[in-house]
Swiss-Prot record:
GO cellular component: cytoplasm; nucleoid
Organism, scientific name: Shigella boydii serotype 18 (strain CDC 3083-94 / BS512)
Domain of life of the native organism: Bacteria
Chain positions covered by the region annotation Leucine-zipper: 208-236
Cellular compartment(s): Cytoplasm, Nucleoid
Keyword Hydrolase: no
Stated name of the protein: Chromosome partition protein MukF
Chief place of localization: cytoplasm
Length: 440
């Protein structure tokens, strides 16, 4: 847990005095990552200048840079890393020109962020929480035993300060990395939907479900251990209350409680925000499908015409006269000549009659589900109704049935953020995606 003893003006003056600065273009950052990777493979953690030049040569080749000035550019990059306190250089008078280099804590921190901290692991989080639980229990036992000031510093304050607090910071960092990954997933989904949403639906579903599962896994692990951690912190807090000279322990316990509450609270809030985004994506896809139902045939027809010579096809039609009247202008002209302008009441009479009949039937039949508190599978109900009507009316009938059914209640599975399975509702490929309504 980070604590700053200096004030803001003091820190600013200190940074200005020491001329701190970091500048890492993509090629220099790649060089630093290469050094960290090669350094991790060595037992002594040391690298010679020749090994650094070899690493720089790999990076230079990857960026397709010239190899004629590789030595000069590598030397400049190494000196720049040393100046920015990313590498430490150790020289010896006995072996002049043969320096040894080690990564600084700053260099390790940057490379850890890009390499080791990018992968979420439930096992790693569980091990961290297990270690924290053990440290807190021992600290709580020591606090209840009591003792002199040395006892409190060694057995209570030190484990909380240098073990528990650092692991809490690591968990907090994991959550912040998950925030970045969520934003990256959102950008990937946006790019997929902008290119071809129909082909991207399966990829979007995979990205949404994977992120939801990871967030839920992280939160479940935290909540499972959160109560025990808070209980041990309260034990320590209760033990310090009779002692006025243990304010430093009490302050640290309060900071740890706030950190733990913030971690668990943000985990749940992150899940809620992701559920909202998941619904937004599905709403967009459903809207696009509704708007695109008439475009599907046109797109398939256009593709078939373009590939006719590679894949010939034959058109079978039942009404030759109808085939000649495909232009909108001609159809409108013919309708006006034969029937004139159709009255509004007559135009919607048949549809309104169907809607009234269906509403009465649905209200009567679906009332049984609400009365008996029986789950309502919307896919089965819609399929049953569509089987009673011709294919031409399936779209309107399905819309009416769904509109009436959702007024009865909601599906508790909607709040999990997991998408429902697609269910066929007729024999012509139409499907519906809806959870079972089980709360009226």
């Amino acid at each position: 847990m980070s604590e700053f003893s200096q004030t803001v003006p003091e820190l600013v003056a200190w940074a200005r005095k020491n001329d701190f600065s970091i500048s890492l273009p993509v090629d220099r950052l790649s060089f630093l990552l290469a050094v960290a990777t090669l350094n991790g493979e060595r037992l002594d953690g040391e690298m010679s200048e020749g090994e650094l030049v070899d690493a720089f040569r790999h990076v230079s080749d990857a960026f397709e840079q010239t190899s004629e000035t590789i030595g000069v550019r590598a030397n400049n990059a190494i000196n720049d890393m040393v100046r920015q306190r990313l590498l430490n250089r150790f020289t010896s008078e006995q072996a002049e020109g043969n320096a040894i280099y080690r990564l600084t804590p700053l260099g390790i921190g940057i490379t850890d962020y890009y390499i080791r901290q990018r992968e979420f692991s439930t096992l790693r989080l569980s091990m961290q929480l297990s270690i924290v639980a053990g440290e807190l229990k021992r600290a709580a036992d020591a606090a209840e035993e009591g003792g002199d000031e040395f006892h409190w510093h060694r057995n209570v304050y030190a484990p909380l300060k240098y073990s528990v607090a650092e692991i809490f910071d690591s968990i907090d960092l994991t959550q912040r990395l998950m925030d970045e990954q969520q934003q990256q997933v959102k950008d990937d989904i946006a790019q997929l939907l902008n290119k071809d949403w129909r082909a991207a639906i399966s990829s979007c579903e995979l990205l949404l479900s994977e992120t939801s599962g990871t967030l839920r896994e992280l939160q479940d692990t935290l909540e499972a251990a959160g109560d025990k951690l808070q209980a041990n912190l309260l034990r320590i807090q209760d033990a310090t209350m009779p002692h006025d000279d243990l304010h430093f322990v009490d302050r640290l316990v309060f900071d740890l409680q706030s950190k733990l509450d913030r971690i668990i609270s943000w985990g749940q809030q992150s899940i809620d925000l992701w559920i909202g985004y998941d619904r937004h994506v599905h709403k967009f896809i459903r809207t696009a499908i509704d708007m695109d139902k008439n475009r599907v045939f046109a797109q398939r027809l256009r593709q078939s015409v373009q590939t006719y010579f590679d894949e010939p096809w034959a058109l079978t039609y039942a009404n030759a006269d109808r085939l000649l009247d495909m232009r909108d202008e001609e159809m409108a002209l013919r309708d006006e000549e034969v029937t004139g302008e159709l009255p509004e009441d007559l135009e919607y009479e048949e549809f309104n009659e169907i809607r009234e009949q269906l509403a009465a039937i649905i209200e009567e039949q679906l009332a049984v589900y609400k009365t008996r508190q029986v789950p309502l599978d919307l896919g089965l109900v819609v399929r049953e109704y569509l089987s009673q009507y011709p294919r031409a009316r399936h779209f309107d009938v399905a819309r009416i049935v769904i509109d009436q059914a959702v007024r009865l209640g909601v599906a508790q599975a909607d709040f999990t953020g997991l998408p429902a399975k697609w269910q066929p509702i007729n024999d012509y490929g139409a499907k519906v995606q809806a959870h079972v309504i089980d709360k009226y």
